[in-house]
Amino acid sequence: MRFSANIAIIVNIIFLFIVVEFVLPTFIRSGDVRFRRYYRNNGRVSRAATAKKERIWPEGIIPFVIASNFSGEHQHLFLRAMRHWENFTCVSFVPRQPHHKHYITFTVDKCGCCSYVGRRGEGPQAISIGKNCDKFGIVVHELGHVVGFWHEHTRPDRDMYVDIFYKSIQTGQDYNFEKSKPEEVDSLGEPYDFSSIMHYARDTFSRGAFYDTILPKPNSGFRLEIGQRVQLSEGDIRQTKKLYKCAECGGTLMQESGNLAIQHAGVCTWHIISPQGHTIFLNITGSTLSPPSSLCGKEEDNVITVRDGVSISSPVLDRICGGDSLFRTIASSGNRMLIQVRSSTPAASLPFATYYAICGGPIYANEGVIHSPKYPESYPPNSDCQWTIHVDENSQVAIEFVYFHLEQHKECIYDRLILTEGISKNSKKDGKEMSETFCGLIEKKTIVSKTNQISLRFFSDNSVQKTGFELRFTKELNECATDKNICHHYCVNTVGGFKCACRVGYSLSSNGFSCDSTCGGYLKASNGSISSPNFPEMYPNSKTCIWEIEAPDGYHIFLNFTKFNVEGMKTECAYDYVKIGDSEKLCGEYHEALLFTTPRNRVRIEFSSDSSVERDGFFANFIADFDECQNDNAGCEHTCQNRLGSYVCTCNPGYILAEDKHNCKEGSCFFEVNAPAGDINSPNYPNDYPKGQNCSWHFVTTPGHRLMLTFSSFQVEEHAQCKYDAVSVYDGGDGSAQLAGVFCGLAPPPLLLSSSNELYLTFSSDASVSRRGFQAHYTSLCGGRLTAESTPGHIYSHATFSDSKYGKNQDCSWIVRAKSPGRGVRIQFSTFNIESEEGCQYDYIEIYDGPEATLERLVGRFCGDTSPEVITSTGPELLLIMHTDNAEEEKGFVAEYREAPRSSSTKRTFVSKTRHSPLEEPIHDRNE
C-alpha cells in the first residue's frame, strides 16, 4: 500500500534548533520472553524563527565536516545516511572545502540527537549524533532537519489527523508537541504523512513504558506504526524535490555505470556520484539536440554542459551546442560530475550518453580520500583497483585507515588491499619493493611510507563481499629531523607532528619536551625490588615510571608483587595500570601475591597513573633464576616448567607423572572446569587419543548463567550407535543428569546449551582404533530457568562479576519458579549498580510477576545504584530481565532468590536514580 505524504517545511524560511525525541521499538527475543527495547534522549533547545530565504541551502549543496572523535563505523554510517538523501533527491552532501563558509558539523552535544532546521547562515552549525542516535534511520531523520524539515506532527492542521495525550507526556516536555503557526510552515499542497521519517513515534517522550503520547485518529484509516526510522517516505522525497526545485528530468546516479536520456524539452540535470578515488567517464553517443541556437553559448538553449563537480559554478569540462559533433568522451578529475541539458524542442526519450566510474589511477595531491568501489555499500565481486599516490618531494605518505572491512582470511587470499612502497635506497629489501597486505576488520591504523610515493591495489574475489574501506592520505614530514625537534632525550615522529619521550628513569615534564629524573630506571642485577612512587603512601597523579630489568643470559626473571592496589577494574585498566613486557595491563586490588615469570632475561615494567584517583600502589621483589628447561627439556617427557630454583615436569591431558617425576603414563582423566569461558580437548590432542581411555569434565559457571559448548574439531571412531569411542554430554553436574547427546564420527556435535550453571562431559575410547579426538570451546551465557528452594540461590548480572563490568548490548532473562506447590518466589538485591538515567532507558532491570513480559505483570523497571525493595510474586513464578545498550557499563547486580509464601499483591514501581511513586494505569495500552 502506498500512502500520500507531507512534511512540515520551512516557508519564508524558519530557523530552528530542534532536538529529536523518539522511541524506536524493536522486538527482542530472549529465551521464551518477548519484550520491547526503547531508545530515548532527553531535552530540547528552544526554537528561534526567521523569515530569511537564505535558510535554503544554495543549489541544495550541503558541505559537511565529521568531528574526529567519531569512529570509522560512525563515519561510514553518516555517509550511508547522506547518500540515502542524495539518491532520492537533488540535495548533495559534500566534504567541506575552505571556500565553504556555511556547513554542518557532525558532533556530540549535550542535547543528544539534535539539529538546526535549514541553513543557519552563521558559519558552522552542529548536527549532534549522541548516545543511541547512531542508527541509520535516526541519522537520516536528523539530516531531514538540516535539509529544512520540521517534525510532521507540528504542522498547523495536525489535529485533523492525530490525537495528543498530554497526561502521558513527561513533565516539562509538552512543548515538543506544540503546533507551528500557519505562517511558519508550508505543506506545499501535500497531505499529512503518517509514514514520514520526520514523524514522532507513538510513545515519544512518554513518561513510562507502554504509554502513548501521539496516535493517528481512529477515523484516519492509518493502521501501521508511526515514527518509522527506516527510510525516506515517498512524501519526504516529493517535498524535498519541491522545496529545492529539483529538475523533473534527470536525477542522481550512483551506479557504477548507466545511461542518460532526455525525456522532454526544457532542463534536464544529472548528478553522477562515485566513491572518492574514482574517475567518471561520460561517453556522448548520439545527437538529441535541435540545430544551433544563438543562445547556446550562454547555456540558455540547445546545449549540453558537463561540469567537473557538483555545482553550476564547478569548472566546465565541455560545452556542446546543437549541431556540433556530439561523439566524445569526457573524464572527471574527481568523484562527481554534473550534466545539464537545455533544449527548446521535445526530443525522443533515447539515451544520448553513457557513463561509467573507474577505480584507481595516479593521484598527485598532498591529501585526499580513497574509497573502495560502491562505498559506503558493499564492494562488487571481482574488483581490481590500483591507486598510486604521489606527494611532494622529500615528504612521506601517511595513510589512515578510517574504516576497513574486507573478507577475513588469515593469509588474505580472498579479498585484500596491498600497499607497496616506492623503491628508494631506504626501502629496498633484497632488491624487492616493500609491501604489506591487509584484510578482515581493522578499527584504527596509520601507515607512514618511507618515500613520497605509495601504491595501493585492491582485489575482491567472486564470493563474499563486505563494506570495503575509507582511507585518508596526507603529506607527512619527519619533524624529528628538523629544527622543530626540541626534545631533551628522544623525539618520536607522529602523523602531523611529533612527541617527546624520555630514557628509562626519567619522566616527561609538563612542558612536553624536557625530562625529569624520577621513578624507574635500568636495573642489571640478580635480585632487587621496585615500587610505585611514595609507596606505601598514595602514588601521585599523572605519573609514568619505566623499569628495565636485565638478568644474565640463560636466566629468567621472577616477579613477586606482594602488594598491589592500582585504580581500575582488573580486566578494564582504562585509568592507572602496570604493564609487564608485552602482556596486558594490570590494575585493581589483589589480596594475594601476583607472580610472573618472564620468557627471557630482560623485562620492561611500566607504571602509569592518570590525573584523578590515587591508590596505595605496589611493591614487587624480583630475582633471576637459571632456566633448567632450556637444556634437553630437563629430561621431561612432555612439558618442562621452570620454577624458582628448580623445575617441574608436567604431562598432557589424560596422563599423570610417573614415579621418576620425568616420564608420563596414562592416569586419571577428570577435570573440574570453573572458568566462565575456555577450551578443552581430548587427551594427547591434536595427536591421536590413547586407547582404553575414560575422561570426564565437570563445568561450573557463575550462578544464574548457562554454559554453551561448541566443538571446533571432532574426529572420534565412527559407529552407528557410538559403541566403541564416544563423547557424552549431560545437562547437569554428573552422569545421572539428563543426557543431552552421545556423539562419534567426523561430524561435530551441534551447539549444546545447558539449562543451569553446570554441564558434564565424558569421553571414552576402547582398546582398538584411535583418532585425533576433539577440541571444544565453552562460554557462559546469561539467563535461564531457575528453581527457588528454601535455601537461597543467586543470580549474577554477568559471569565475570567483580572482575569486570557487565557487557554492552546484553539482553538476559531469568525465570525463577518455586519448587514447592502453593509457594511463591522472593527476590532481593545485595548489590545493585546499573547505569543511571532518569527514565531507565539505557541499561535497566525489569521484574515481572509471572513468567511473561506483559504490561499487567510488570512490577517495575530499575536502574542506578539504589537496590529495589524486596519483591515477592503472587504466583509460582517471577521473571527478571536485564538489558544493556551499546555505551556505558557499570558493576552490575547480585540477586538472592528463594521460595516464600505468595504475596497477595505486588506494588508497581519505576526506579531510576531516585525512587518514584507507583505508576498510574496507562491512558492508552499498546496493542501488541
Curated annotation (Swiss-Prot):
Stretches the record annotates as Disordered: 895-928
The name this protein goes by in its record: Zinc metalloproteinase nas-39
Entry keyword set: Disulfide bond, EGF-like domain, Glycoprotein, Hydrolase, Metal-binding, Metalloprotease, Protease, Repeat, Secreted, Signal, Zinc, Zymogen
Subcellular location per the Swiss-Prot or TrEMBL entry: Secreted
Active site feature: 142
Phenotypic consequence of gene deletion: No visible phenotype.
Signal peptide range: 1-30
Pfam families, alphabetized: Astacin, CUB, EGF_CA, FXa_inhibition
Principal subcellular localisation of the protein: secreted
Lineage: Eukaryota, Metazoa, Ecdysozoa, Nematoda, Chromadorea
